[in-house]
Amino acid sequence: MPTSYGYTTLLKTTLVCCLLTALVSIFLPALLPLTATGSAAVIIFTLYFFRDPERRIPLDQQVIVAPADGKILLIQPLDHAFTGNDSTLVSIFMSPFNVHVNRIPLDGTIVHLRYVPGKFLMAFDNRSMESNEKMEIGIDNGSLRVLFIQVAGFLARRIVCPLHRNESVLSGKRFGMIKFGSRVDMILPAAVKIMVQSGQKTCAGETIIGRY
């Protein structure tokens, strides 16, 4: 089933494709087979892009799961005001072919929520973390604080994040998406042992990024 976050886009895409096909059938009937095939392909890809499969969420309460499908782009040490010194940055690159529904990485309470306007550099460009439009989300579970960031990209210029400050959230819960690719950056405190490596594929809600 497609995610509800994509219903508007799906409706608009379907209407445009149907209208285009209808107009071609009237004014340029010779191009109808090509137009109909192209329109069907666009609709099928849009449905594929907004797919939202179920996931097996780990029951272990001491793990942090991936917030996004994709591939580990970068792991590096980082000091951050929200998570403290000796934190670790883990960046997940999402291609247009990945599932784009994002999921909460651990149980806790939303204590930080900040939208930051910015540029739309390519997601695999590490400057995008600082320069691009993004949504910062911070969770506190009483034992540690984790920050994760939805980063817009060159193609992905629409961040969806319906969360609210002081909202209680559960690990693996769907919470939004980044439309048409980009990246999600995680900043994990020193207490977290990183369980992934660069180049590894991730599955939102299932892949264990770290333990604490």
UniProtKB/Swiss-Prot annotation:
Keywords: Cell membrane, Decarboxylase, Lipid biosynthesis, Lipid metabolism, Lyase, Membrane, Phospholipid biosynthesis, Phospholipid metabolism, Pyruvate, Zymogen
Name of the protein in its database record: Phosphatidylserine decarboxylase proenzyme
Annotated membrane topology: Peripheral membrane protein
Species assigned in the record: Chlorobium phaeobacteroides (strain DSM 266 / SMG 266 / 2430)
Active-site residue list: S182 (schiff-base intermediate with substrate)
NCBIfam families: PRK05305.1-2 (NF003678), PRK05305.2-2 (NF003682), PRK05305.2-5 (NF003685)
Domain of life: Bacteria
Any one cellular-component term (Gene Ontology): plasma membrane
Cofactor note: Binds 1 pyruvoyl group covalently per subunit.
Role: Catalyzes the formation of phosphatidylethanolamine (PtdEtn) from phosphatidylserine (PtdSer).
Enzyme class of the recorded protein, top EC level: lyase
GO molecular function: phosphatidylserine decarboxylase activity
Known EC number: 4.1.1.65
